[in-house]
């Protein structure tokens, strides 16, 4: 990941910056929404206020027009000068309201028509206790124009409401698109900052996985990202170097220990053989028994040293190259190698290979099968059964080694693959177990990208399962 000049140096700074930048579009959207809401609120208040004023003025003008006509007719009937003054006062008041209402009317012709009719009604003209014919016509024209004014005012008020609704809808659509854009911007920033944080974490995870697989990290690992994660990466590098050093010291110690034990052991074996051959003189039956015990113990010690060396060598070996391995020849070889002890215990072996091949290293797989089958023979019940079977499950091949006998206690199952662990059920035979066989077998299987574990099979006492990658020829 490329480091920017302004890249946050710490994880806290990066997280705070991420929160701020992600919240920024939302804050901008909230601020604009607040501004727009205020503007729409003010506009709605203005529309309501002007609408109320215009509607009341229109109603007042209608009432004034009716009062003018009533005063006009009363004057013609009573010929009272006071009524003439009232009429002129009403006419003046209507004229003032008409001037104020002129900006509301959508058409200036309507205003001019009302103004002309109002001017024509300036003089009172009566005939036979009523307006003369011309005056009556002017009053009727004025009333008709006033009605048109009221209708025009209503149209204007309605158009204002529609305009406000359109603006609200346009603002809503605008904020909808803006919300979508800002959401996408926030999403991009979330993904960007997630990558900035997860990237170094993934690198650390890969380093830990390599450590768990027993591979060295080397000194070529580069770190980027916040200082806390870089510090963790450096500590993991230090841990890798420390583990490599400890591993080398362990291998060296085991080599030296095995070498130092071999020399006195060889002398012990040679002396025991000389005593057993009675080279130094005849032995009594009691002495022969002691010599036999010494010989058996020295052989057990020699086997333990050889297993230690084998375990050490396989731990230090590099990654193996997997190849297509036919299972039938390996199984046949393993069964034949242990046919005598199996026959001595009158044990029967069944072979059922539904999966005929897998990806493995032939010698390592044979070593594992030999160990598991040997355990089945020596730990199994006399006159019991052993079953070697294989099956295909997706891209994996299962190889089961099953025997009848005493089941492994539940409390020991998590420990049987640990080096030097020996369970409560002891091995039957001339050679005592060392506790390294299953540990070596599991390490070998893991080096072949597989797994070895104990499973519970219905009707079976003990079942060890090998899981390996399947080959293209597996059926």
Swiss-Prot record:
Example of a GO cellular component annotation carried by this entry: plasma membrane
Disruption phenotype: Mutants can still form pedestals.
Modified residues (Phosphohistidine): 259
UniProt-listed Pfam families: HAMP (PF00672), HATPase_c (PF02518), HisKA (PF00512)
GO molecular function: ATP binding; phosphorelay response regulator activity; phosphorelay sensor kinase activity; protein kinase activator activity
Ranges facing Periplasmic side: 35-173
Class of enzymatic activity (EC top level): transferase
Factors inducing expression: Induced by epinephrine during late exponential growth, probably via the QseC sensor.
Keywords attached to this entry: ATP-binding, Cell inner membrane, Cell membrane, Kinase, Membrane, Nucleotide-binding, Phosphoprotein, Transferase, Transmembrane, Transmembrane helix, Two-component regulatory system
GO biological process, one term: osmosensory signaling via phosphorelay pathway
Annotated function: Member of the two-component regulatory system QseF/QseE involved in the regulation of virulence and metabolism in EHEC. Required for pedestal formation in host epithelial cells during infection. Autophosphorylates in response to epinephrine, sulfate or phosphate and then probably transfers its phosphate group to QseF.
Protein name: Sensor histidine kinase QseE
Organism: Escherichia coli O157:H7
